């Protein structure tokens, strides 16, 4: 029943225009019923060529668990293109959803579905397409590691499309569960281009690097009696000519029970 309900809701999302991809690996268990989440994701790229450096992406998000298996967020996305003297623009208004299809440990791997709807907020020379993104999020514990993979398809919609195919993106995280406050991880982010028409690997974006992940109870920080502050901080190395030399990525999230 849960799988049928999740796919029904996800199918409804696909009839609407998704947001740009953030450097964050989606867990199939990101469902926190009874908690309010305030989240910020950011990424900044650096390159030896000024024309390829300076791109930045930031999000502000508000989310909660709508049911025991459905987590939903509303997000504002801000972007700055690479190059000198580029403006920072509010580019997307996003509805982001994660559907948990199995309980952690119930099957060989934990499985979820991710679906996003994004409406472009830009016009004129900076106009961008609306997008819808959909795909599986799968996680598997092996020893003290948690291994998570995302495989997403994105379709552009609206009058400002630059592609009419399905774009394929993927992400991988292997995290060593050392402690609540600090766990090291390795992440991979790639964009393979249009499904069935992928360019050579050298022309695809592929980033790999270390990430620190952890959480602190708010009461331990003197900020209240309940809730958590979660963080992620990493450096991603570009491995192809189409990728920036390096990308700094960060994430802060405050969880408040209600």
Predicted regions located by residue number:
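Sec-dependent signal peptide recognition
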Residues: 2-9
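N-terminal signal peptide c-region/cleavage motif recognized by signal peptidases
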Residues: 16-18
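Repetitive helical segments and hydrophobic/amphipathic motifs
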Residues: 11-14
